[in-house]
């Protein structure tokens, strides 16, 4: 899948789940399941509940996403 097919949203982590999965509330109010991108996992970026994150969604499944950036 190319980078052009990805939809980006800002959101907030509301719950941490096992296996680096997170429940994220998007800015439009929807709640999705998201996992950490490989580069964030490699660099040991820690994500806690309440963190602002940037999430990538595919147009094929809008209920799952990938966290690509952690804000302050």
UniProtKB/Swiss-Prot annotation:
Question: Which CDD domains does the record cross-reference, listed alphabetically?
Answer: S1_IF1
Keyword hit for Methyltransferase: no
Q: Matching SMART domains, A to Z?
A: S1
Could you tell me which residue ranges the S1-like domain spans? 1-72
Q: Kindly list the GO molecular function terms attached to this UniProt entry.
A: ribosome binding; rRNA binding; translation initiation factor activity
Pfam families assigned to the protein according to its UniProt record, in alphabetical order: eIF-1a
Query: Matching InterPro entries, A to Z?
Result: NA-bd_OB-fold, RNA-binding_domain_S1_IF1, S1_domain, TIF_IF1
- What are the protein's UniProt keywords? Cytoplasm, Initiation factor, Protein biosynthesis, RNA-binding, rRNA-binding
Q: Could you tell me where this protein is found in the cell?
A: Cytoplasm
PANTHER family from the entry? TRANSLATION INITIATION FACTOR IF-1, CHLOROPLASTIC (PTHR33370:SF1)
Role: One of the essential components for the initiation of protein synthesis. Stabilizes the binding of IF-2 and IF-3 on the 30S subunit to which N-formylmethionyl-tRNA(fMet) subsequently binds. Helps modulate mRNA selection, yielding the 30S pre-initiation complex (PIC). Upon addition of the 50S ribosomal subunit IF-1, IF-2 and IF-3 are released leaving the mature 70S translation initiation complex.
Share what the entry says about its subunit structure, partners included.
Component of the 30S ribosomal translation pre-initiation complex which assembles on the 30S ribosome in the order IF-2 and IF-3, IF-1 and N-formylmethionyl-tRNA(fMet); mRNA recruitment can occur at any time during PIC assembly.
- The name on file for this protein is Translation initiation factor IF-1
Gene name, per UniProt, is infA
